[in-house]
Amino acid sequence: MKIKIIFSYDGSAFLGSATQPHKKGVQDALSGALSHLGIFSPLLMASRTDKGVHASYAVASVECGDYFTNLEYLQKQLNKFSHPFIHIKKIEKVKDDFEVRFDVKSREYRYIFSHASYSPFMASYVHFYPKFDLGKANELLGFFVGKKDLKFFCKSGGDNKTTLREIFIARAYAYKDFSIFHFKANGFLRGQIRLSVASVLKVLEGKMSEKELKEQIEAKKQYNHFLAPPNGLYLSRICY
């Protein structure tokens, strides 16, 4: 029996979501929790995130045999071995031909800025940043929407066959003392969102022009090579 695991994780506790040489990845921790329950099949992840990036909604799949017919019980037991940095939100039975990565229709991320006074207790979970013009940020993010060749918004080391992506949503909104950038696309390149966020901030700071941002989005020239910090970024939705 193949199952789909929907879960969240605190990225500050891991070196990234993928398996790591010293077993410090989210995939390693969740595989270890499954092994305590006698499930040793390879765990497959729908998305990869870098060190320090969080997920409020991540998805994985694994073959678990026919022993665990009570999925609510499996969820409860798996949480015992996954806490405190991973929380299993739901487990569903899926078809044998379900592909957790390649069946994805869209992914969503949110980047969270806090405009409150700095707190070391929140430093791993938001990017502390002065207030900015949210309307202007929305305008700049709108440049990303559509089918784009985002080769200048990609870190090296990815396994992508193409740098073409379709961005469905790129917007900014406010919530209490936070400003949030929301991205939805059919897929993302490695480092794409953090490069996008940093580029928008550069324009807001007057260190880069709108024309330069547009040229980078149009794959004409790269003006910004820097990434926004990982701690403000959250994988927030995966749709099939």
From Swiss-Prot:
Q: Which CDD domains match?
A: PseudoU_synth_EcTruA (cd02570)
Keywords, sorted A to Z: Isomerase, tRNA processing
Explain the purpose of this protein: Formation of pseudouridine at positions 38, 39 and 40 in the anticodon stem and loop of transfer RNAs.
Q: What is its EC number?
A: 5.4.99.12
Complex formation: Homodimer.
The record's listing under InterPro entries reads: PsdUridine_synth_cat_dom_sf (IPR020103), PsdUridine_synth_TruA (IPR001406), PsdUridine_synth_TruA_a/b_dom (IPR020097), PsdUridine_synth_TruA_C (IPR020095), TruA/RsuA/RluB/E/F_N (IPR020094)
> Sorted alphabetically, which PANTHER family does this protein's record hold?
PSEUDOURIDYLATE SYNTHASE, TRNA PSEUDOURIDINE SYNTHASE-LIKE 1
Report the sequence similarity comment from the record: Belongs to the tRNA pseudouridine synthase TruA family.
Q: Where are the transmembrane segments?
A: none
Tell me which residues bind substrate: Y109
Species lineage = Bacteria, Pseudomonadati, Campylobacterota, Epsilonproteobacteria, Campylobacterales
Q: HAMAP family this protein is in?
A: TruA
* NCBIfam families according to UniProt: hisT_truA (TIGR00071)
Please list the residues that make up the active site. Answer: D50 (nucleophile)
Tell me the GO BP annotations in alphabetical order. Answer: tRNA pseudouridine synthesis
Which named protein is this?
Answer: tRNA pseudouridine synthase A
The chemistry this enzyme catalyses reads: uridine(38/39/40) in tRNA = pseudouridine(38/39/40) in tRNA
List GO molecular-function terms, semicolon-separated.
Answer: RNA binding; tRNA pseudouridine(38-40) synthase activity
Pfam families in UniProt: PseudoU_synth_1
